[in-house]
Amino acid sequence: MHIAALHQPSQVQLNQDGNLKHFLTIEGLSKENLTKILDTAQSFLDDNNNLINRPLLEGRTVMNLFFENSTRTRTTFEAAAKRLSANVLNIDIARSSTSKGETLRDTLWNLEAMAADIFVVRHSSSGAAHFIAKDVCPKVAIINAGDGRHAHPTQAMLDMLTIRRETKKPFEDLSVAIIGDIKHSRVARSDVAALQTLGCKDIRVIAPNTLLPVGFSEYGDHVRLFNNMDEGITGCDVIIALRIQNERIDSPALSSQSEFYRMYGLNKERLSLAKPDCIVMHPGPMNRGVEIDSSIADGEQSVILKQVTNGIAVRMAVLALSMQGQLQEQGLIEAIAL
């Protein structure tokens, strides 16, 4: 079974013309939808991987609503919005009226009344972004910047853009390994869904049983489970290392971090089992010496910093595409090169 089949296609994410209205999850979107995001992001990068500014959202207001701490995701969304000439407001949730007992609905309705065009939302509760898009502020474009263990769609798309740009191979021809804390990782879920939707036929998930989600067998024929890391990464084109999500683990899942590194840490010896041109990725933040050795994180096969740059391009694309209908009305959509 395809992972997308585990969920009802999200009618909330697309408008009546089939264009992106909200970006909440990978599930429910087609290969064409995802390719459109990738192609749009590509248009914001030159041949030297430098970002290209375009004033497509001039006069629009983007509000970053981060109910969970974040550095990389929040700042790249802010950078993306500013490169599109949008006004950006970072709402300090800890000091907002929600800390004084105001409901989430009332907080969001007040922010919507301030003429916000886009909310970028990170929340600890799975499904929070979908709830806001469907039941609270349907007129504001909602971009999910991570909700609990559920989804991190822009991270998945920046990972897909990095894979496409760096391997220069069709997804159908790639072997991709995802290693680490799969159970608690929204990145893993979104990456698997995106890889499947884009046609990857060899997705390898490598983890101890304690860090695998329940019902893993339902993820599909093209997803294989490995408890043995050496076996799992042999012949891979892409390796995505994930950190252990200690903040989401209710009970001990590992005997120790040193034991995890011994069994699942990516080092030079293990990387040599993959293809010679294998690329190494990590969504960050990294725990060096736990899931990845510094020599690999900083090595020639690492594209981790390129992921950060690609993340800005992808978030520019998602922000612009969420306003696509209005941009078309203004005759600006041609500048996105769709």
UniProtKB/Swiss-Prot annotation:
Belongs to the aspartate/ornithine carbamoyltransferase superfamily. ATCase family. SUPFAM superfamilies: Aspartate/ornithine carbamoyltransferase (SSF53671). One of its GO terms (molecular function) is aspartate carbamoyltransferase activity. The lineage of its organism: Bacteria, Pseudomonadati, Pseudomonadota, Gammaproteobacteria, Moraxellales. It catalyses: carbamoyl phosphate + L-aspartate = N-carbamoyl-L-aspartate + phosphate + H(+). Heterododecamer (2C3:3R2) of six catalytic PyrB chains organized as two trimers (C3), and six regulatory PyrI chains organized as three dimers (R2). PANTHER family: ASPARTATE CARBAMOYLTRANSFERASE, ORNITHINE CARBAMOYLTRANSFERASE, MITOCHONDRIAL. It comes from the Bacteria. This is Aspartate carbamoyltransferase catalytic subunit. Carbamoyl phosphate binds at R72, T73, R122, H152, Q155, G284, P285. One of its GO terms (biological process) is 'de novo' UMP biosynthetic process. Its EC number is 2.1.3.2. GO terms for cellular component: cytosol. L-aspartate binds at K100, R186, R243. Pfam families: OTCace, OTCace_N. InterPro entries: Asp/Orn_carbamoyltranf_P-bd, Asp/Orn_carbamoylTrfase, Asp/Orn_carbamoylTrfase_sf, Asp_carbamoyltransf, Asp_carbamoyltransf_Asp/Orn-bd.
